[in-house]
């Protein structure tokens, strides 16, 4: 629910920013068109089969509301907490999207939660808190000047999340709750992509050869021109 409200908040904020800051008068041109890779942070190495339902729930968060629906969606693979996904693992995530799109009526209706006191209230809270964060960034001189501050806040947020999980305050199934489990056929190193070290060595050699043979003067000139244009 909160993830869906975040998308609704983004949509409302973008509409207002486009109208007030940039003077865009056409409501269609102010639509928040976004693509999203849903969060992989919540995927767990323990009981990785639980990651499937986590991925489905995250997909619903960015597709339930028509007015704030992602225009493109990428889902992580169930085993990304274990290692690199194989093509079959990536296909599984693709099939999740296809089942949601073509075997359900998820896309058949408009704003499902329009008028809900819970949804509207939470969305308003998120808009207010997000605007406060945006004001802080603008006060620091914009996104570029605020990079260090934003990185610091991200690290602090992640640290706090880990503290809550380790203390049991935030429940994560299979990690700090309901940890008993039957043996899973999905665990172990056999269920991740293994890259031949020779492939890595060949790629490094190809990159080194390309760098050795490129026209460095042309590269430097192009970078200088790019910097000049960016500063104008």
Regions found by a protein language model. Give the residues of each.
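Structured core elements
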Residues: 33-37, 51-54, 61-63, 72-74, ...
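A glycine-rich, aromatic-flanked flexible loop/lid motif
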Residues: 27-33, 62-72, 99-103, 194-199, ...
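Short beta-alpha connecting loops at secondary-structure transitions
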Residues: 36-49, 55, 73-88, 105-123, ...
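Catalytic-core signal marking the mid-to-C-terminal active-site face
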Residues: 91, 95-232
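Gly/Pro-rich turn-and-neighbor structural signature
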Residues: 1-50, 135
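Structured alpha-helical segments in the cores of large, soluble enzyme domains
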Residues: 10-11, 15-25, 53-67, 92-104
